[in-house]
């Protein structure tokens, strides 16, 4: 954006993991926004905004996200202001996670941010905005 102050954090980008067999995630899949820059003293010390969370798409007939695994697409934190000029930067917006799988062969025991709505069940209706979206493979 315009104006004075520090730069915003980078966006989270996009990650797509797809297979025609089994996808097992036992580590971390991240598409998180970067931290905004801190303000500088003396002039124009507003902190930069955090980068927006990115997008993650997991596609597999059989999907396993094991306990201890993490799948996140969150916004970065805003930078710190430098007194007395400016304010702190705002946080970046939440990203999106989409899953296409066969619900009967899906196990989601890991941590998701944004959060799951209803485990491996197909996501429908209201109350799902800002959450993990799950659809059945055709």
Positions of predicted regions on the chain:
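Parallel beta-helix/beta-solenoid
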Residues: 20, 60-61
């Amino acid at each position: 954006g315009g104006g004075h102050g520090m730069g915003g954090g980078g966006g989270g980008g996009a990650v797509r993991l797809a297979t025609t067999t089994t996808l097992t995630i036992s580590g971390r899949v991240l598409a998180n926004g970067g931290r905004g820059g801190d303000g500088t003293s003396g002039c124009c010390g507003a902190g930069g905004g955090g980068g927006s969370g990115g997008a993650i798409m997991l596609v597999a007939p059989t999907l396993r996200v094991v306990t201890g695994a993490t799948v996140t697409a969150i916004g970065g934190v805003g930078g710190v202001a430098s007194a007395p000029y400016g304010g702190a930067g705002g946080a970046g917006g939440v990203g999106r996670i989409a899953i296409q799988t066969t619900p009967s062969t899906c196990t989601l025991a890991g941590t998701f941010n944004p959060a799951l709505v209803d485990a491996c069940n197909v996501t429908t209706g209201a109350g799902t905005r800002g959450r993990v979206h799950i659809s059945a493979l055709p």
